[in-house]
A protein has these predicted regions:
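FIC/Doc superfamily catalytic core
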Residues: 1-143
Length: 143
């Protein structure tokens, strides 16, 4: 069984952050994981810890590109779409994919998306994020 610290460490390493998780990062994950529901404001608080200075892309012109992916344009619709996504009844896999496609923040989307996935998994990542997500992806493709 992976500890929360293991999960945060792996999530950070995916982003090229090779240091151990900070206490603030661990606490932010614990607080998010303990919520009965996650609202946009909860993710804003989380992202402020894991990526200080990053903001929800609610302003026109706050556009992002990640590799070949161009996220939807920034503006008020991003907040509405994120709220709808959080309220929706999607699988952890599907919600994570839609979240990463939306890319709602100026930075910190990968780590916040993985934290959201962990929350949807009931706070447990028994065999690690990448392994579990890999099999969820295969299952989704087979449906």
């Amino acid at each position: 069984m992976w500890t929360l610290e293991d999960f945060v460490r792996e999530s950070n390493r995916i982003e090229g952050i090779l240091r151990d998780p900070t206490e603030d990062e661990i606490v932010a994950h614990k607080l998010l994981r303990a919520l009965p529901q996650i609202a946009v404001s909860d993710l804003e608080i989380f992202v402020a810890v894991v990526q200080p200075g990053a903001q929800l892309r609610r302003q026109l012109g706050w556009d992002v590109r990640v590799g070949n992916h161009i996220a939807p344009p920034g503006g008020p619709i991003i907040e509405a779409q994120l709220g709808d996504l959080l309220a929706g009844d999607l699988s952890a896999y599907k919600k994570h994919c839609v979240y990463e496609t939306l890319h709602p923040f100026t930075d910190g989307n990968g780590r916040s998306g993985r934290a959201l996935w962990l929350w949807q998994m009931g706070g447990e990542a028994p065999i690690g994020f990448l392994h579990q997500f890999y099999y969820q992806t295969l299952d989704a493709l087979r449906q």
